[in-house]
Every structure is written in structure tokens, then in C-alpha cells.
Amino acid sequence: QECKCHGLSGSCEVKTCWWSQPDFRVIGDYLKDKYDSASEMVVEQHRESRGWVETLRPKYTFFKPPTERDLIYYESSPNFCEPNPETGSFGTRDRVCNVSSHGIDGCDLLCCGRGHNTRTEKRKEKCHCIFHWCCSR
């Protein structure tokens, strides 16, 4: 909720409030946190009076069971390291990676443990520098 005050000289004689969406970054960070802590489930079939019923149970019982607010999954993601025409993935071979990053663009993650080649480039470029005389005597 956001609010704004109205009045003379910034006084808050009238206050108007409205609901607003959180910052997009906050929402993204929240969803990423949920994704990273998602619980893997197993589909079990059992017979009841009305026929076969499928239920989900946590794959790993030593973790606490997921709540209604947690994300769950029962199929693993495909291997994005190798090309897969079915999913349209080209794999990660020959991609440019960032040696100093530990994020998704880092070589350890992006190269899927295959190792990476490092190339050093030297470039001569015009810097478009301009000399500004700063001071008078």
C-alpha cells in the first residue's frame, strides 16, 4: 500500500492511499527463492472404492513436507547442457561464459563440468577522449 499526503506546506490534512504491486525485482527474487527450494514429489497410485487414485508424496521424507505456499514438481527438468531437438535446446557447448562469475553466466555452471577454454584478446580502439582545460591562472 502506498499513501500520499495532501495539504498546505506538506501537512497531512488529507491522506490518499492505494494498493500497488511490489517492485518487479522483489517479485522475481521471491519466485526464484521458491523455485530454488521446490520439493520433489512422487506420484503414487492406489485403489479406492471409486477406482484408481493418484496422490503425491514427498520423494525425500527427511525434509519437511511442502506447505500450500511451496512449489512442488514431479518431473525433473531436461538436461539443458546437451542439445535436444524435442525441447528446442541447443545445449551450452561453445557458449561464451564469464570466468569470474558464480552465477548462471559463470563457466562452472554454463559449461556443465566439461571445462572451458580461456582466450585473451588485445584490442586497439580509439577512446574518443577529449581534453578539457579546467583551470584559469
From Swiss-Prot:
Naturally occurring in which organism (per UniProt): Xenopus laevis
PANTHER family: PROTEIN WNT-3A, WNT RELATED
Localization per record: Secreted, Extracellular space, Extracellular matrix; Secreted
Glycan-modified residues: 98
Lipid attachment points (O-palmitoleoyl serine): 9
GO molecular function per UniProt: cytokine activity; frizzled binding
Cystine bridges: 3-17, 5-12, 97-112, 134-135
Gene: wnt3
Example GO BP: neuron differentiation
Family classification: Belongs to the Wnt family.
Protein's recorded name: Protein Wnt-3
Function description: Ligand for members of the frizzled family of seven transmembrane receptors. Functions in the canonical Wnt signaling pathway that results in activation of transcription factors of the TCF/LEF family. Required for normal embryonic development.
Source species, domain of life: Eukaryota
Alphabetized PROSITE patterns for the sequence: WNT1
PTM summary: Palmitoleoylation is required for efficient binding to frizzled receptors. Depalmitoleoylation leads to Wnt signaling pathway inhibition.
